[in-house]
Swiss-Prot record:
This is SsrA-binding protein. GO terms for molecular function: RNA binding. InterPro entries: SmpB, SsrA-bd_prot, SsrA-bd_prot_CS. NCBIfam families: PRK05422.1 (NF003843), smpB (TIGR00086).
Length: 152
C-alpha cells in the first residue's frame, strides 16, 4: 500500500521494561544531525542509560549514546549530546502534568525507523521495587517451565 510505512526496530531498551513499570507510551520524533542518522542506521545507538526530561516546554533526551562512524572524520558529532524530542504540544502538556506526580519519569523504550524517519517510543514509567523485579523473574521462569513441559 502506498500510505503504509514500514517500522524497522533499530534499538530496544530491554532493561527499561525490567527496571520500570510502563504506564503509557508515546511515539516521538528526534531532532538529529545527518551523521547521527547515519550512525543510528548502522546500529551504533545505545538507550541503556538514557532518560527524558521536560525543560521549558520541550522534551529533551539525555544520555543516549550514538557512537560516531569512523568515516565521519572532522564532521563527527558529540555522542552524548542532549537531543530534542518532537511531540505535539498537547502531549507535552499532558506529560508535564504526569511527570510532576511522585515517582514518574520518562524512559526511552525503542528507537525505530518509520519510513525514512527515526522515531522513539517514550514510556511514562514508575520505578519497580526489588520484590516486583523478583516476582517478574519468578513468573518468567514458571512460564518457561510450563512451555518446556508442554513440548515433551
Amino acid at each position: 500500500m502506498a500510505g503504509e510505512k514500514t517500522r524497522k526496530i533499530l534499538v530496544d531498551n530491554r532493561k527499561a521494561r525490567f527496571e520500570y513499570e510502563i504506564l503509557e507510551t508515546y511515539s516521538a520524533g528526534l531532532a538529529l544531525l545527518g551523521t547521527e542518522v547515519k550512525a543510528i542506521r548502522a546500529g551504533r545507538a545505545n538507550l541503556n542509560d538514557a532518560f527524558a526530561r521536560i525543560h521549558h516546554g520541550e522534551v529533551l533526551l539525555y544520555n543516549m549514546n550514538i557512537s560516531p562512524l569512523q568515516t565521519a572524520g572532522a564532521f563527527a558529532h558529540d555522542p552524548l549530546r542532549t537531543r530534542k524530542l518532537l511531540l505535539k504540544r498537547r502531549e507535552i502538556h499532558k506529560l508535564t502534568g504526569r511527570v510532576e506526580e511522585k515517582g514518574l519519569t520518562l524512559i526511552p523504550l525503542k528507537l525505530y525507523l518509520e519510513g525514512s524517519w527515526v522515531k522513539l517510543d517514550l514510556g511514562l514509567a514508575r520505578g519497580k521495587k526489588l520484590y516486583d523485579k523478583r516476582e517478574d523473574i519468578k513468573k518468567r521462569e514458571t512460564k518457561r517451565d510450563i512451555e518446556r513441559a508442554m513440548r515433551r
